[in-house]
Amino acid sequence: MQLDEPIPHPNQIDKPWLTALLKKNGVLASNGIRHIQVDASPSTNAHIARIQIEYDAGAQRDAPRSLILKTVEAGAGFVRNSEVNYYARDYLDLADAPIPKCYAAHVDSDNGSYSILMEDLSSTHDKDTSPGFQYGLEVASALARLHVFGWGEERIQKLDGRISDNAKLDRYIAHVRQGLDWLLEATRTDIPDLWREAILDIFEHHPRKMWERTNDPTGFTIVHGDINPGNILYPVNGGKVYFLDRQPFTWSLTTWLGVSDLSYLMVQYWDTEQRRQLELSVLEQYHRQLIDNGVTDYGWDQLLADYKLCIPQVVYTVAEWCIQPEDRDRMRWLWRLELERAMHAFFDWGCAP
């Protein structure tokens, strides 16, 4: 894998550069590349280019036929190096990791912009898969394997993390709290008083519960932080699940309860009835896989308590959408739905203080 040299701009990638790179990665021997085609793809927080490759006869069977080049500009607000480390460093020792193979990555040491060249799985996997029973089990299993690799204080530290202390939690809460008044104003006429009271109760009482939970390190890991359907690659005809885009913002919690990645997905992105039908099965599978992968000190009751603790964090995500006026208006279709789902889960699980 190439880490020490800049990756060319998509319109400057040519056959000699790509041939040398693939040979360095051990997936191309003497045969060369016949043709490449580079096309831009839409993306929210990055520039994406798809590189399709045709080889001379006799190329190695594992030589990639398509690659994705992701470029993130300086000033995007993400934690420096996090995504590059996700693809190119943190999980290299995790056998069969649920992460696309990375062929090259580079971070600009001056401004923090970065590029990642990875395998393109779009021919075998889909994004935004509608949740079902098997989907939920496979996502839970893959997520448990990822979490176990960074599970507990010792492994968290090996990945340059630490369990969030009060100062980190204070910064997180202070950031999302900026959107609270705007959220309440934007929903002044279209949410019931019960929801309004619940939102206020969450911001008043829930942070203390988060602080108290950090006194016990059990259940903490390096979290992905954005396990949404668009970041889950699900196999079309069998195979493993992959997770894309660990891109925490500078205010995000990068180390937190592992089950928070599942509450984020199921509460925020699944229809309420889908969540109600599937969530316990998904949580049971996640817990089984934690145990099967070596976690011995995290009981089922504690996992359920942690899941319940993490549900109100979806309201923090909604409040964060309301900080900037353009997001508040442009993304109302999304955050209003997320709020509704969060409130149903909040009352389903009895999360009130």
Mark where each language-model region is:
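Glycine- and acidic
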Residues: 72, 125-129, 244-247, 264-272
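Conserved structural core of kinase catalytic domains
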Residues: 104-138
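Active-site acidic catalytic loop and adjacent metal/ATP-binding pocket
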Residues: 40-58, 204-258
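Conserved NTP-binding catalytic cores of kinases and kinase-like/nucleotidyltransferase enzymes
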Residues: 1-113, 235-241, 353
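AlphaC helix (C-helix) of the protein kinase catalytic domain N-lobe
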Residues: 87, 143-146, 265
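Regulatory N- and C-terminal appendages and interdomain linkers associated
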Residues: 1-43, 56-64, 154, 210-217, ...
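ATP-dependent phospho-/nucleotidyl transfer catalytic cores
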Residues: 125-224, 235-237, 334-337, 345-352
